[in-house]
Amino acid sequence: MDASPNHVARLTGKRVLVVEDEALVSMLIEDELRDAGAEVVGPAISVDDALRLVETAATAGGISAAVLDINLDGQHVAPVADQLAALNVPFLFATGYGANYDVGGHGAVPVVQKPFDLEQLVATVEALACASTRR
């Protein structure tokens, strides 16, 4: 996938965790983030996978931001969100559930609705990663 001129290298040097159980959606997210210069951590397709990646990444360069699908094959992503919040890693939720989603106590976190505009997703990740003190 060619990099859009609107977001070329905006995420250079940033490590972004992708937690998404739908393979095609995950590949789209990963491609856009890489096109924007990010190093993608993951993807994780389950809560357990994501928690392992967070633990490993915390000692291997950190995580600048994360994209979390709210529902991972019936499991709520809240434990991952809680762990990221405890580490001061900013994240956003991606959901296809419209207004009927549970953010598990993280009401101030940005929510990107599926199907999402990839430019909006990258811009939101960029804002999170650049505001983060953990680069």
What are these language model-derived features?
Residues 75-89:
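Short amphipathic alpha-helix used as the core "switch/output" element in two-component signaling
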Residues 69:
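Active-site residues of response regulator receiver
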Residues 46, 66, 74-79:
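Acidic catalytic/metal-coordinating carboxylates
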Residues 1-15, 60, 103, 110, ...:
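Non-catalytic signal-transmission and effector/linker regions of two-component phosphorelay proteins
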Residues 20:
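Conserved acidic carboxylate
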Residues 92-95:
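Hydrophobic/aromatic residues positioned on beta-strands within the core alpha/beta folds
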Residues 23-42:
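Two-component/phosphorelay signaling modules centered on CheY-like receiver
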Residues 43-65:
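Acidic, metal-coordinating helix/loop segments flanking the phosphotransfer/catalytic sites
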